């Protein structure tokens, strides 16, 4: 069976369950943060997207997304780069949209904060 390419910068609806404790749960939009050329397993590194709250405004690992036709989101959200995780491609449900290059650069900067790079 041929693999479907799921590319860096795509927003996909993903089933994140089961989870434990404070991990973000349920079926929700997530951002693919790894380049498809990296890795040999059918896994994607994902960052969950959650509802925007004012308290997230100055959090360095939260990247704000404004709803737009390109990203397929319906309300203001944030990408939570502190909750990045690998998921099997079978958890990916549907393509919602993409983020732009500037936002992808912000995501990479936030990942550097999270990983201390």
Question: What kind of region is each of these model predictions?
Answer:
Residues 1-117:
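Conserved functional hotspots at enzyme active or ligand-binding sites that engage polyanionic ligands
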């Amino acid at each position: 069976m041929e693999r479907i390419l799921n590319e860096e910068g795509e927003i996909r609806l993903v089933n994140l369950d089961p989870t434990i404790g404070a991990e973000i749960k349920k079926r929700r939009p997530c951002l693919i943060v790894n380049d498809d050329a990296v890795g040999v397993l059918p896994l994607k590194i994902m960052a969950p997207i959650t509802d925007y709250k004012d308290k997230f405004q100055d959090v360095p690992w939260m990247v704000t997304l404004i709803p737009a036709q390109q990203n397929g989101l319906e309300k203001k959200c944030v990408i939570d780069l502190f909750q990045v995780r690998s998921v099997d491609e079978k958890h990916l449900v549907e393509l919602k949209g993409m983020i732009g290059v500037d936002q992808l650069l912000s995501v990479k900067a936030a990942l550097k904060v999270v990983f201390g790079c």
